[in-house]
Amino acid sequence: MKMILSLFAQFAATVFAAEFAAGFVHWLEDAYIRERTPLIGRFVGRPNTIHHHYPRHMTRNSWWQSSWDLVLFAALLVAGAWSVGLLTWHVWLFAILAANANEFHKWEHRTRKENGRLISFLQDIKLLQTSKHHALHHTDPKNSHYCTITNVLNPVLDTLRFWDGHEWLLAKTIGLHRQPDTSVRGCGPGPAWLAEFSPQMARTNNRLPSNGESLLSHPSA
């Protein structure tokens, strides 16, 4: 019995560690990276801006398009752990979850029909984060609920003001301030190039369902 409880605790801790790591990266991207950010702005800031204005847009991406960078990170993690003899099941689980963090995120923006019965069931019983929970991240001022795998960590981190505290610390110590998010009401307008990604344009090209089919389809949901 003790062994079973120990394994369960290790499994849960690994899941939450992976979710926290993915949430931490998500926070960094949302708070500080924009399309004009040197080197990574085009690859990280631009897609992030699109996502905050048009959350449903990410659902048209394939698994590889959504996850290639995380897969490379996970591969490096596994290779590093293997090279020093520390490649345990915990590392494998962490790597698999981290590599698929954007896929979990994508499920929260898809309809139940798009997700299918299994994913929808896991969301219904709260083993996976629900769309309703993630919708809080897309509610102005869009500065909370960065973790996207379960419903567990966000209430804890946000109650502790974990992200606010880190932003305050970075501003006070190195002068790094959170960047404005043009998808937040009153902080726009967004960049002109966003027009080509609007839901109206997407429907014209038969790329996305109508707004009524998703809780998070509105640009400022």
Where are the regions a protein language model picked out?
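Core segments of transmembrane alpha-helices
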Residues: W64-W82
